[in-house]
Amino acid sequence: MLIPRRVKHRKQHHPGRSGAATGGTKVSFGEWGIQALSPAYVTNRQIESARIAMTRHIKRGGKVWINIYPDRPLTKKPAETRMGSGKGSPEWWVSNVKPGRVLFELSGVSEEVAREALRLAIHKLPLKARIVRREGGE
């Protein structure tokens, strides 16, 4: 599970989800990638679930890169608690994903295997996404 080892502040403001991604919009390490088409908070559990789905499908071949990291805490107040008395306790670690961001990359497998593995991973994520191929330099 991806969790920061230590953080300067235990609780943060919620990051804004509007606007498009400014960096990390191209496939840079692998041959294939998953590109976000909608904004979302992706939790560390969702990232791990997508990674497992991909690696199980490609079996021993290929290499997977994870380009996002859950570095923001999201807080939650306990059920049936009155409002007030401070901010809730950190519940999840999330990555703020904006449209255009490449989340995962994959290489070392055939096109059919890569497309199916990435399709399985997309189903584990809480956003709309598409499969993209590396541009040029093949």
From Swiss-Prot:
Family, per entry: Belongs to the universal ribosomal protein uL16 family.
Which PROSITE patterns does this entry report, sorted A to Z?
RIBOSOMAL_L16_1, RIBOSOMAL_L16_2
The name under which this protein is listed is Large ribosomal subunit protein uL16
Tell me, what does this protein do in biology? Binds 23S rRNA and is also seen to make contacts with the A and possibly P site tRNAs.
**Stretches for region Disordered:** 1-24
Per UniProt, the keywords (alphabetical) are: Ribonucleoprotein, Ribosomal protein, RNA-binding, rRNA-binding, tRNA-binding
Basic residues bias: start-end ranges: 1-16
| Assembly, per entry | Part of the 50S ribosomal subunit.
Superkingdom of this protein's organism: Bacteria
Record-linked Pfam families: Ribosomal_L16 (PF00252)
List cellular component terms (GO).
Answer: cytosolic large ribosomal subunit
Q: Name one GO molecular function term.
A: rRNA binding
Q: Which GO terms describe its biological process?
A: translation
Annotated disulfide bonds: none
